[in-house]
């Protein structure tokens, strides 16, 4: 990582591996992260026809550290101190320093993924407009192994077990036939000079769309905590996992702390914490009913319930 400045002053640098901090008169200016520079504008494929690209970024781990220390003017210390500070900030929910880091992505995903994505309103979004542009015929078709029946436990998800290969092939063929018919109907309306804003209204949710997405690191971590969860739909989870790796290139210490405390962590209620202490003391479990079932499932699966 390299910190650059346009200010005049005496430079002091502390080099640790690939990390180099330059402090001018106690201030840190523009932050250039080598690992992030290496992947700028690179396409990371997701699903069958989608991708994510990192278009731009502002700041990294060093920016978080400097934002946290600005109140008392302390300069940058060592990489170990910085990682410890970032970890302290994240686990104690000091969010403002993380909002100093901003990432901009170019995303291509099916419309149904985009609609889940855009429920996260603390971001800036610019999506391709089908009122101005002609739509492509690119539609998402799930892999055969992704085709499953409705879950009996999760009202908004599919079952973990699949169906027979013959049924999976039949469902995929039905998807493709419906998509082809919908796109042909769209083309027919366009050829009749029907307004694009009307011709588009029956296109399938599987059609791919594109958008630019700019978000600060604090709100990005919130997005990833929800969308990289095992509870999220598999398709948007695939995008979230790619974005985690891109984010790691920009802010590796912050991403590691996020994974440890939020993505892979579990929260306990007051009564659950009391029950956990009782178990550690060799006492019985006082929780009952659904509360007990949720608590035991947290301990078993490591997933938030």
From Swiss-Prot:
Q: Which family does it belong to?
A: Belongs to the thymidylate synthase ThyX family.
Which pathway does UniProt place it in?
A: Pyrimidine metabolism; dTTP biosynthesis
EC annotation? 2.1.1.148
Q: Which keywords does UniProt give here?
A: FAD, Flavoprotein, Methyltransferase, NADP, Nucleotide biosynthesis, Transferase
Protein name (database record): Flavin-dependent thymidylate synthase
Cofactor requirement: FAD
Cite the active-site annotation.
Answer: 227 (involved in ionization of n3 of dump, leading to its activation)
Q: Which InterPro entries match?
A: Thymidylate_synthase_ThyX, Thymidylate_synthase_ThyX_sf
Domain named ThyX: residues: 50-261
Quaternary structure per UniProt?
A: Homotetramer.
Question: Has the keyword Transferase been applied to this entry?
Answer: yes
């Amino acid at each position: 990582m390299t910190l650059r400045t346009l200010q005049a002053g005496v430079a002091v640098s502390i080099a640790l591996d690939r990390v180099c901090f330059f402090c001018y008169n106690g201030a840190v200016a523009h932050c250039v992260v080598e690992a992030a520079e290496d992947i700028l504008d690179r396409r990371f494929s997701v699903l069958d026809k989608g991708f994510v690209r990192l278009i731009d970024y502002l700041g990294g781990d060093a920016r978080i550290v400097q934002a946290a220390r600005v109140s008392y003017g302390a300069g940058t210390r060592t990489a170990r101190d910085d990682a410890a500070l970032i970890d302290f900030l994240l686990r104690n929910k000091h969010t403002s320093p993380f909002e100093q880091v901003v990432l901009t992505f170019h995303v291509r995903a099916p419309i149904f993924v985009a609609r889940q994505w855009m429920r996260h309103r603390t971001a800036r979004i610019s999506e391709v407009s089908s009122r101005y542009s002609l739509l492509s015929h690119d539609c998402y078709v799930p892999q055969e192994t992704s085709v499953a029946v409705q879950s009996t436990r999760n009202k908004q998800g599919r079952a973990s077990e699949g169906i027979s290969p013959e049924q999976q092939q039949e469902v995929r063929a039905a998807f493709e036939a419906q998509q082809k018919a919908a796109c042909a109907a769209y083309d027919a309306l366009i050829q009749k000079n029907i307004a694009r804003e009307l011709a588009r209204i029956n296109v399938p949710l599987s059609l791919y769309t594109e958008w630019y997405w700019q978000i600060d690191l604090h709100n990005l971590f919130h997005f990833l905590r929800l969308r990289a969860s095992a509870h999220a739909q598999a398709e948007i989870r695939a995008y979230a996992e790619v974005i985690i790796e891109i984010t790691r290139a920009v802010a590796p210490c912050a991403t590691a702390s996020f994974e440890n405390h939020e993505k892979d962590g579990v929260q306990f209620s007051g009564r659950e914490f009391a029950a956990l202490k009782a178990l550690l003391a060799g006492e019985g479990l006082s929780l009952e009913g659904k509360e007990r079932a949720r608590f035991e499932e947290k301990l078993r699966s490591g997933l938030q319930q």
